[in-house]
Amino acid sequence: MVVKIGILKCGNIGMSPVVDLCLDERADRNDIDVRVLGSGAKMNPDQVEEVAKKMVEEVKPDFIVYIGPNPAAPGPKKAREILSAGGIPAVIIGDAPGIKDKDAMAEEGLGYVLIKCDPMIGARRQFLDPVEMAMFNADVIRVLAGTGALRVVQNAIDDMVFAVEEGKEIPLPKIVITEQKAVEAMDFANPYAKAKAMAAFVMAEKVADIDVKGCFMTKEMEKYIPIVASAHETIRYAAKLVDEARELEKATDAVSRKPHAGAGQILNKCKLMEKPE
């Protein structure tokens, strides 16, 4: 059986570029077929409505994953409205601002995965250009991967896939990813590696607070430019911490790897030269 997954990308968070790729990291999985629709960097209600309706009415997947910033904003709320009424199981993946709407999403019959370490970018024209944007997102992706947050998201979607394959009711995740949930998913062998990953997670959370201050709460240019710049420096060092954590695991040949089999099962290995089972 091939499970058809629909992914809606409206706006961008750090998890957005890899949410589909983490389900099929070698492009050889034969049990899923993924379709991605998106509205680019913007997530205004009209744009979101267009792609959400197309997903529900034309693509008609087995389930839908919506991903983007702030699920409580007007555009994402429009998507939630369409998905809630669409008759297709759906999950919302978002960042920390969505936590205040998690109960509302559950009442709408939607699942959610809210990632506390996926921070807002420093979106000030005097600071943010395409290069800075790409480097920030690269650092965030490194934090998501190295702390275990990415693995939590991947596991939640895989559980939905496995339910479809087994003919069971699709479980709609209701997850807020904290530093504890993230590092548990990574199976760290070295407690210092785990501690470094936890520190990186908390630093990434703080980046969001700094960028909110720089983007929305500070009006003077000479003040908000160094504020958002400091947020980007913070995520850069958080990414360095997850590198350090992984190097500690490498030193004892204990890196947790969980690749997908061709048929979709999640395999497991820790030693570099052993086969996954």
From Swiss-Prot:
Catalyzes the reversible reduction of methenyl-H(4)MPT(+) to methylene-H(4)MPT. GO terms for biological process: methanogenesis, from carbon dioxide; one-carbon metabolic process. The keyword Oxidoreductase applies. Pfam families: MTD (PF01993). Its EC number is 1.5.98.1. It catalyses: 5,10-methylenetetrahydromethanopterin + oxidized coenzyme F420-(gamma-L-Glu)(n) + 2 H(+) = 5,10-methenyl-5,6,7,8-tetrahydromethanopterin + reduced coenzyme F420-(gamma-L-Glu)(n). It comes from the Archaea. HAMAP family: MTD. It is an enzyme of class 1 (oxidoreductase). This is F420-dependent methylenetetrahydromethanopterin dehydrogenase. Keywords: Methanogenesis, One-carbon metabolism, Oxidoreductase. Coiled coil: none annotated. Belongs to the MTD family. Pathway: One-carbon metabolism; methanogenesis from CO(2); 5,10-methylene-5,6,7,8-tetrahydromethanopterin from 5,10-methenyl-5,6,7,8-tetrahydromethanopterin (coenzyme F420 route): step 1/1. GO terms for molecular function: ferredoxin hydrogenase activity; methylenetetrahydromethanopterin dehydrogenase activity. The keyword Transferase does not apply. Signal peptide: none annotated.
